[in-house]
Amino acid sequence: MTNKQPVRVAVTGAAGQIGYSLLFRIAAGDMLGKDQPVILQLLEITPALKALQGVVMELRDGAYPLLADVVTSDDPLVAFKDADYALLVGAMPRKAGMERGDLLGANGGIFKPQGQALNQVASRDVKVLVVGNPANTNALIAQQNAPDLDPRQFTAMVRLDHNRAISQLAEKTGQPVSAIKNITIWGNHSSTQYPDLSQATVGGRPALDLVDRTWYEQEYIPTVAKRGAAIIEARGASSAASAASAAIDHMRDWALGTSEGEWVSMGIPSDGSYGVPEGLIYGFPVTVKDGKYQIVQGLEISEFSRGKMDATARELEEERDEIRKLGLIS
């Protein structure tokens, strides 16, 4: 067993589909390591608190040695109190006929108060991952409403796209996913994202030597970008288990570090690297050491890549301008 003090992990939307796939894995130590006890602090909207109690009963019935305690609330000031990690999963899904502005406005009503609550009561070193879509811009809303925290503490999940990109390439090349290194997802977690294979390797060989350029540009990129829609079409519901798994991967790498010589994709505040407008929450290739991420520098950007990277940046700028107009950020 462990002598480590428990850390506090806040999860919003905890009674939802992704929450249900996520909480048991956090309790089992998949996210922060098999020697790190956790206190789960679960936030839900008032009507979902009863369902959340059922999830808590199951968490307790799992008798997880690492699960030190579970707190539930419909108040972010309770759920985020002293949180070391916060996974913001709960969001307003897009409904038929909704314009992007409507969706951003509805989510602003969630992420603005959550940013303010994190600012008020979370640990000063809290690591925040926004999973709820539109994740990049929801992360920006939360971040801009938490002025006392370092902007770099707010990240958005592009790891699901990253994992999808790995698995599609593995399938195409007939190699195990473990053979694939250094794929990058640039930009927004949306259909404008750019899954970039220009630096990727498969078993040490350049990925683009192993696949056809036409397949890469015309099939691979759209397949990865539209995978979420394909899952809804097939399953009748959005991806939940794979999203939870990606959230675990993102937080584990942020907390425990990336492997030597490898990078992963994280949605993080741009510092202007690669000509991406500063301040946007944008997918970049990063390495992590001692809980701090760094953008991988010095990668060659082709004309094709530049066009894709700029297009997804433009979409994020439009979303930022929209939330500014709505008064969600200044």
UniProtKB/Swiss-Prot annotation:
**One of the Pfam families matching this protein, by short name:** Ldh_1_C
Residues of the active site are H189
Q: Which GO terms describe its molecular function?
A: L-malate dehydrogenase (NAD+) activity
- Class of enzymatic activity (EC top level): oxidoreductase
Its BP terms in the Gene Ontology are: malate metabolic process; tricarboxylic acid cycle
Q: Which positions does UniProt annotate for substrate binding?
A: R94, R100, N133, R164
**InterPro entries linked:** L-lactate/malate_DH, Lactate/malate_DH_C, Lactate/malate_DH_N, Lactate_DH/Glyco_Ohase_4_C, Malate_DH_type2, NAD(P)-bd_dom_sf
Which parts of the sequence bind NAD(+)?
Answer: G13, A14, A15, G16, Q17, I18, G19, N107, Q114, V131, G132, N133
List keywords of the entry alphabetically. NAD, Oxidoreductase, Tricarboxylic acid cycle
* Keyword NAD (UniProt): yes
Reactions catalysed, as given in the entry: (S)-malate + NAD(+) = oxaloacetate + NADH + H(+)
Q: Does the keyword NAD apply?
A: yes
Q: What is its EC number?
A: 1.1.1.37
Task: Give the top-rank taxon of the lineage listed in the UniProt record for this protein.
Answer: Bacteria
Protein task: Catalyzes the reversible oxidation of malate to oxaloacetate.
* Family per record: Belongs to the LDH/MDH superfamily. MDH type 2 family.
Q: Which NCBIfam families match?
A: MalateDH-SF1, PRK05442.1
What HAMAP family does its record include?
Answer: Malate_dehydrog_2
What's the protein called, per UniProt?
Malate dehydrogenase
Which species is this record about?
Answer: Deinococcus deserti (strain DSM 17065 / CIP 109153 / LMG 22923 / VCD115)
Q: What is the lineage of its organism?
A: Bacteria, Thermotogati, Deinococcota, Deinococci, Deinococcales
Gene name of this polypeptide: mdh
